[in-house]
């Protein structure tokens, strides 16, 4: 079922957003697909909203459900705007990365603390025009959250 954000009930709000690969949304209980329009165009896929472990989760297939977007073409601004529109305050974004350290084996879970982005020529901010673009729930502070102790 597809629901326009304008017609949604507050129970579709989610506290955690997940940008992931296709198929994850199948883990959500009672998932409902929501299509959201943003000032940046549509997000990469409809957002599946459901419950996992007692929490409301919003899942978006980062590259589209049929892998419609190459990594450098993912509409990240639309993806983030859509999540903020749903009330999401925390994002989990698992991804595949490589390592030059032989002690880190394929399939192991790591939390990266460095990112080298060698791409160029794409937008990388919401603030291209002015200091305040009015993103839902936005503020100007950078927030860091401890992943694990």
Task: Place the predicted regions along the sequence by residue.
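Metabolite-binding pocket within alpha/beta catalytic cores that recognizes anionic/polar moieties
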Residues: 1-143
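Short, intrinsically disordered, charge-balanced linker/junction segments flanking boundaries
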Residues: 143-149
């Amino acid at each position: 079922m597809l629901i326009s954000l304008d017609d949604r009930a507050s129970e579709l709000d989610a506290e955690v957003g997940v940008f992931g690969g296709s198929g994850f949304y199948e883990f959500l209980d009672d998932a409902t697909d929501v299509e959201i329009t943003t000032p940046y165009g549509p997000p990469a896929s409809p957002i599946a909203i459901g419950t996992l472990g007692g929490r409301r989760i919003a899942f978006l297939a980062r590259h589209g459900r049929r892998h419609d977007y190459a990594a450098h073409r993912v509409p990240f601004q639309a993806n983030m705007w859509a999540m903020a529109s749903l009330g999401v305050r925390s994002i989990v974004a698992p991804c595949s990365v490589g390592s030059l350290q032989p002690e880190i084996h394929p399939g192991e879970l790591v939390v990266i603390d460095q990112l080298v982005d060698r791409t160029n020529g794409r937008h990388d901010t919401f603030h291209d025009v002015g200091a305040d673009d009015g993103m839902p729930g936005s503020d100007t502070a950078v927030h860091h959250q401890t992943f694990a102790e």
